[in-house]
């Protein structure tokens, strides 16, 4: 009930200003006498996935808490896991503003943020200070000014730094807002990247005497043939999981709505069926070889169940959380 009032006020602000304001307040509430305002006591619905134990199958997708500023506050709301990032080796400002747009009628968002973040070292300091007891995923990417041909180096730098602190590491090669990034999803470039990542993972396993699983985040805009090739590469390189999907570039889904022609990736309800279709196809190709984390347009218990019925072992929310607030977490976890 209270979130509908909060949302009404926040939606009067520019989307990015609303996000920044909300995060400042969440940070203040965390570990304060007023944390009860965001705390939700939810039943345990344990899931084992990628060799990890999750208290429930619902997580927060990357992109909302890029710098790990509000891990504990978000954790208090009942998520089974939280994915922070995307983070890059060096801090970067991202693309020019405005770069985030609401499509309220469709409960969608278009963003062209461009991996704005304070860098991997800042994220690690925030993770160290966190008291969150759930599984923490850390999503990593490449800096905009790193040539795509050398992008692999950025992922390896980030892996080296986050490995001791991550429950799992997510490799983001599917954001549409970093020029050339999505080319890493194809053919030789993908094989080269996955080979380097697997080798680094095994090296770090030896160094730290613990195995941190790696999941690759893919786009919803892959053709069926491209998806078959991606699935084959993931299996051949013994990747631990796949996150499906990132945002779509297909704006036909929101044709005629305000902001529908803005450049960037579309998320929220409009991408729901597209991402579910990718999950279903992936599930058919992978045949259980590795688990799928389903994300894209989950805004209700029904949408969450659709993702899991399509083959997802875990699910994540982002836009749906912005539109529906903590009640969405409660509804899904209570009844999933």
UniProtKB/Swiss-Prot annotation:
Residue positions of the active site: 175 (nucleophile)
SUPFAM superfamilies: FMN-linked oxidoreductases
Pathway: Pyrimidine metabolism; UMP biosynthesis via de novo pathway; orotate from (S)-dihydroorotate (quinone route): step 1/1
Gene Ontology cellular-component annotations: cytoplasm; plasma membrane
Membrane topology reported for the UniProt record: Peripheral membrane protein
Gene Ontology MF term list: dihydroorotate dehydrogenase (quinone) activity
Binding locations of FMN: 62-66, 86, 139, 172, 217, 245, 268, 297, 318-319
Coiled-coil region list: none
Described function: Catalyzes the conversion of dihydroorotate to orotate with quinone as electron acceptor.
CDD domains noted in UniProt: DHOD_2_like
Cofactor needs: FMN
NCBIfam families per the UniProt record, alphabetical: PRK05286.1-1 (NF003644), PRK05286.1-2 (NF003645), PRK05286.1-4 (NF003646), PRK05286.2-5 (NF003652), pyrD_sub2 (TIGR01036)
Transmembrane segments: none
Identification of the protein by name: Dihydroorotate dehydrogenase (quinone)
Family that this chain belongs to: Belongs to the dihydroorotate dehydrogenase family. Type 2 subfamily.
InterPro entries xrefs: Aldolase_TIM, DHO_dehydrogenase, Dihydroorotate_DH_1_2, Dihydroorotate_DH_2, Dihydroorotate_DH_cat, Dihydroorotate_DH_CS
Catalyzed reactions per annotation: (S)-dihydroorotate + a quinone = orotate + a quinol
EC number: 1.3.5.2
Amino acids binding substrate: 66, 111-115, 172, 177, 246-247
UniProt GO BP: 'de novo' pyrimidine nucleobase biosynthetic process; 'de novo' UMP biosynthetic process
Organism: Proteus mirabilis (strain HI4320)
Alphabetically ordered keywords of this record: Cell membrane, Flavoprotein, FMN, Membrane, Oxidoreductase, Pyrimidine biosynthesis
Record note on quaternary structure: Monomer.
Binding note for cofactor: Binds 1 FMN per subunit.
